[in-house]
Structures are given as C-alpha cells and as structure tokens.
Amino acid sequence: MDTETLKKNLQEKMEKALKVLDHELKGLRTGRASVNLLDSVIVEAYGSKIPLSQVASISTPDARTINVQVWDKSMVSLVEKGITIANLGLTPATDGQLIRLPIPILTEERRKELVKLAHKYGEDTKISLRNIRRDGNEELKKLEKNNILTKDEHHSLSEQVQKLTNDYSNKVDSAIKQKEQEIMTV
C-alpha cells in the first residue's frame, strides 16, 4: 500500500466516523419537531422489520408537532407500537390513518441529559478517530520496517496523520458545541 492510498483510506474512515456522529446527533430531540427524530423507528410488518419512512409519510406542520400519515390502514397500530418501542418520549395520538406526535417542551433537567448524551457521542467518535490514527501509524511502521519508508518519511507522515486526526477532532468538537447550543436554546 502506498502512502497516498493510506492517507486517503484514513480520511475516508474519519469522514465515516463523523457521519455516524452527525446521524446520532440528528436523533437527539431539541424541543423542535424534526422528521429526523423518527429515523430510528422500526415497524414490524409483513413478517419483517421496516423503517417507518417506508410505510408512512412524515411531516412537521409546526415546530411542536410531527405528523405520520400511514399509507395502509391495517398498519396504524403497528406504526404506533414502533414509535412507542423506539422510546423517544413521544406519545402518539391517532386520528384514522394520521398519527400526531406532539413534541413536549423539554425541561431543564432533560436538556442537560441530552447535552451529556451529545458529549458521550462526541467522545465515542473521538475514540474511533484515535483508533483509526493508531491503525494508520501501525501501517506506517510496517512500511518503515519493510524499508519502503525512511525514518524521516515515517516521521513526516505520522505528523500528517496526527494533523488529520486533530482536524477531525476539531470538527467533532464544533458539531457537539452546535448541538449543545441547539438543545439549550429555549
């Protein structure tokens, strides 16, 4: 493996870790209605587990309500069950094939819990970044050991890997800070 491919692979892995964090943060409730809140809802139907978005259309008519329009009338109770099982703290109110999910106002205590959870997600992502960095550095050591890299090249590339890790770590910090502000805004 050449060094350019190695750097590209490390960057792709770090980008994936950042996307996972972004997806996890979108799932945190901020007190505002967002269709992303229901991304984790799975409905057991037709003998398999199906994402909610494949059995209903989801909309946000206002900042405090999510509407779930179920396409198949026989699925309404299964969709309700899926929303309840997802443990999002939302109480479904059914009206025919329309399920309304009023978004409760977040208490100060709940906001602090969500901020802690966001920080945990951030720390988990940073651990992933450090593991990716470690793997990259081990690969560089192998290349040096096999006389493909000189000691100076190894040192220079290690610094580049560290800089890449620092850049992504800063992106994690800024994503967490932004989410924290979003959560704490009343």
From Swiss-Prot:
The keyword Cytoplasm applies. Pfam families: RRF. InterPro entries: Ribosome_recyc_fac, Ribosome_recyc_fac_dom, RRF_sf. Its main location: cytoplasm. Gene3D superfamilies: 3.30.1360.40, Ribosome-recycling factor. It is found in: Cytoplasm. Responsible for the release of ribosomes from messenger RNA at the termination of protein biosynthesis. May increase the efficiency of translation by recycling ribosomes from one round of translation to another. This is Ribosome-recycling factor. It comes from Rickettsia canadensis (strain McKiel). The gene is frr.
